[in-house]
């Protein structure tokens, strides 16, 4: 499939974890076990560390989890803080988002941001962009806002941040729909596409399928290479830990 590396953000487990120790073990899995497992298949494995927005409603608990994150940011395969963001756009989620942005700034980390799904996406994206723009210390070039769709992609790119189009067979964005977005809004230098294995119907080969769709729509090989390889590498190489070459 042409995959060169795997980048895995800290994510919801399908259920809310009940202890800080549960998060500690999960972070160990991301930073110790998964790189070894991927290496058996000759794939470099990188990760992002955070408490995700679906588990950020309990402020006391979330802050206890945040306290253990800095030691994992030092791991050689951790690229930054993510995916932080919003789920239901609640006051508590905003508070934990802001505290994890501060954590990233304190440790000079890249930031990966999750935007809400369905009817909350536009409101949540606007709120996230406003929060980021209010802090002059934030370098937009070091922030990727993921899961953009037709009604949010322009907002993210025009604000100077990186935008991620997440590919799924049913939810989020199918490869043909993603290419529709590229034809409508252009293939920005701050845009990439990513696929993943989620809790719903997923296809980790969505990105190779998107490449086929791009070729069918007469995108040049240079444009395709920029979207699916050069752009991600440019963003990720801002972390000195990311070792793939352009």
Roles of regions detected by a PLM:
Residues 1-119, 123-131, 143-151, 158:
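Mid-domain alpha/beta scaffold segments of enzyme catalytic cores
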Residues 11-13, 167-172, 198:
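Short, acidic/turn-prone active-site loops that include or flank metal/cofactor-
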Residues 39-41, 134-139, 185-187, 216-222:
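Short helix-capping segments at alpha-helix termini
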Residues 47, 83, 104, 163, ...:
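Conserved, mostly hydrophobic/aromatic
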Residues 55-63, 166-176:
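Active-site glycine- and acidic-residue-rich loops that bind
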Residues 121-130, 153-159, 173-182, 199-213, ...:
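Histidine/acidic-residue-rich catalytic or RNA/ligand-binding cores of hydrolases
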Residues 188-204, 224:
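Short acidic/histidine-rich active-site segments
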Residues 208-246:
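Mid-to-C-terminal alpha-helical segments outside catalytic/metal-binding sites
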